[in-house]
Amino acid sequence: MAERQKAVAKQEKVTISKRDPWALKKWFAVHAPPYLGGVFLAEVPATEAEKLLMRTLEVSLYDITKDISHLPVKLKFQIHRVEGLRALTRFKGLELSRDYVKSLVRKGTSKVVAITEVKTKDGMDMRVSVMVITAHRLGTAQKSAVRKKITETLLKKASEMDTSQFLKEVLEGTLAADLFIAAKKIAPLRKVEFAKIKVLKYPPEEERVVVKEAVAEAAS
C-alpha cells in the first residue's frame, strides 16, 4: 500500500513538472497613459502582476491615433502600475524612424538639430532633440540662431507645463507648431519635428507611486 502511494505521489510530481508554463500565466491588457485616452496597446502574459512593473513596450503613434502620418513616430511606454488585469503605462521615450528623417532632408535645404535637457513644471527631466528642416540652405550663423531660438522656446514652454500637457502637445504636434512659428522669424522653414525624446527622471510623486506599487505587490 505504501509503495503504491509513493508511486502515485511520484507520478503527480512528474505531471506537475511537465505542466505547460504558459498555463500558469495570466494575460494583462496594457493601456496608454490618460493623456492619450488610455487606449489599449497590447496584451502581455505574466505569472504575477509584479513581474510586469518596469517592463517596456514599443509601439507606433499610429497604433494609438490611426493616423497614417504617425507611422514613423516610435514610442516607448513603461508599465508602472497594475490594477487587476489592467497594466497602466507611462511615457519613456520617442524616436523618429531613420528612413523618415532621411526622406525630409533634400538638396538645397539644411537640417538643424537642437538638443537640450528640459524640466516640466512637475519635475520631469527629459533630453529632447528637435529637428528643423529649412526651406533653403543656411549659413553657420543662421543655423546657430535657429538652434538658439528653438532651445529657448522649448525650455520656456516645458517649464510652464506639467508632464501630461507637455507630452500631449508633443504628440499632437501643437508644440512643434509653436517652435516653427518662433524660429521662422529667423529663416524660412519647411518642417519642425521632435526627433527624439528620452526620459531622464520622472516626477518625484510618480516615482513614489511606482515604489509603493512594487512594495505592495511584493508583500501580497
Curated annotation (Swiss-Prot):
Q: Which GO terms describe its molecular function?
A: structural constituent of ribosome
What keywords are assigned to this protein?
Ribonucleoprotein, Ribosomal protein
* One biological process term in Gene Ontology: translation
The domain of life is Archaea
Cellular compartments per GO CC? ribonucleoprotein complex; ribosome
Q: Which InterPro entries match?
A: Ribosomal_eS1, Ribosomal_eS1_arc
Q: What family name appears in the similarity comment?
A: Belongs to the eukaryotic ribosomal protein eS1 family.
User: What name appears for this protein in its UniProt entry?
Assistant: Small ribosomal subunit protein eS1
Naturally occurring in which organism (per UniProt): Pyrobaculum arsenaticum (strain DSM 13514 / JCM 11321 / PZ6)
Query: Which gene name does the record give?
Result: rps3ae
